[in-house]
Swiss-Prot record:
Protein name: 4-hydroxy-3-methylbut-2-enyl diphosphate reductase
Binding positions (isopentenyl diphosphate): 40, 70, 119, 209-211, 251
Binding annotation for dimethylallyl diphosphate: 40, 70, 119, 209-211, 251
Residues that bind (2E)-4-hydroxy-3-methylbut-2-enyl diphosphate: 40, 70, 119, 151, 209-211, 251
Cofactor or coenzyme needed: [4Fe-4S] cluster
A biological-process GO annotation: dimethylallyl diphosphate biosynthetic process
Task performed by this protein: Catalyzes the conversion of 1-hydroxy-2-methyl-2-(E)-butenyl 4-diphosphate (HMBPP) into a mixture of isopentenyl diphosphate (IPP) and dimethylallyl diphosphate (DMAPP). Acts in the terminal step of the DOXP/MEP pathway for isoprenoid precursor biosynthesis.
Binding residues annotated for [4Fe-4S] cluster, in chain numbering: 12, 92, 181
Cofactor note: Binds 1 [4Fe-4S] cluster per subunit.
Length: 279
């Protein structure tokens, strides 16, 4: 069994920055709180909670409130700044650019955002500008529209959505903006290419991570694919595959990918190298 690891694995810069900042604050002895997962990865969150991070909405539980990488509505951010002695905004810069773009273009047409309505990033966006958030094409009486996307969406799926919307409706003016994170687009491209030579694709990441789910769907088009959060989830029959490729979401630590590779090696796999992890 040949093991190949994608070049682009591990944290993206936004996730890396968020985790490093929280760890530094905790190391300074500060009581750090947030209102949800900093990033969508169970192991990462368990580690931060063990180090002292608290998930709470009670101001008495902490001195520093950290805003998650997905962002929060602007009005909520202002309220938090009045409650806590210190608020550290860890919104990913690319996500924040989406919020700014939504506000800037809201006067030019109805905002239609390709994304999951209940995703934290989309909840935050609607605090910056009113928008329709959906993944399903629909008929509308709107004549002027602006298309945006959740930053972790599949570029191909976003384009298909916009194409269907234009076919279904009679827009007088439709503005299409690519607001998908370039880091996730590059991983998407690599998965589409590398999975073609794989018998099995192992996608490593949190089960409620949008960008990891996207990679899993893409890998499934070209090979058998499994989505795991830990090495323990790798099935015993993996040994029947000749070439196994390993991919990861942007909130997956390199240490977890190394553990997955180690488990595959224990199952008679031979590591054929890549540029993504240290061996």
């Amino acid at each position: 069994m040949k093991i190949i690891v994608a070049k682009n694995v591990g944290f993206c810069f936004g996730v890396e920055r968020a985790i490093r900042t929280v760890e530094n604050l905790l190391n300074e002895g500060k009581r750090v709180v947030t209102d949800g997962e900093i990033v969508h990865n169970r192991q990462v969150m368990e580690d931060l909670l063990k180090k002292g991070l608290k998930i709470s909405s009670d101001p008495t539980d902490g001195d520093v409130f950290v805003v998650r990488a997905h962002g929060i509505p602007e009005e909520k951010l202002e309220k938090l700044r009045k409650i806590y002695p210190e608020v550290v905004d860890l919104t990913c810069p690319i996500v924040f650019q989406l919020f700014r773009t939504a506000r800037e273009y809201s006067s030019r047409g109805k905002l239609i955002v390709f994304g999951k309505r209940d995703h934290p990033e989309m909840v935050a966006l609607m605090g910056y500008a009113p928008a329709i958030v959906t993944k399903k094409p629909f008929k509308t009486e709107e004549k002027n529209v602006v298309f945006l996307s959740q930053t972790t969406s599949s570029l191909d799926e976003y384009r298909e959505f916009v194409s269907e919307m234009i076919k279904m409706n009679n827009f007088e003016k439709a503005i299409y903006l690519n607001t998908i994170c370039p880091v996730t687009v590059e991983r998407e491209r690599e998965v589409k290419e590398l999975s073609k030579i794989c018998d099995l694709s192992v996608v490593v990441g949190g089960k409620h991570s949008s960008n990891t789910g996207k990679l899993f769907r893409l890998a499934s088009r070209n090979s058998r694919a499994i989505w795991v959060e830990s090495p323990d989830e790798i099935p015993e029959d993996v040994v029947k595959y000749g070439t196994v490729c390993v991919f990861s979401g942007t909130s997956t630590p390199v240490s977890l990918i190394e553990n997955v590779v180690r488990k595959l090696e224990e199952m008679e796999g031979k590591y054929y190298g890549t540029n993504g992890i240290q061996r």
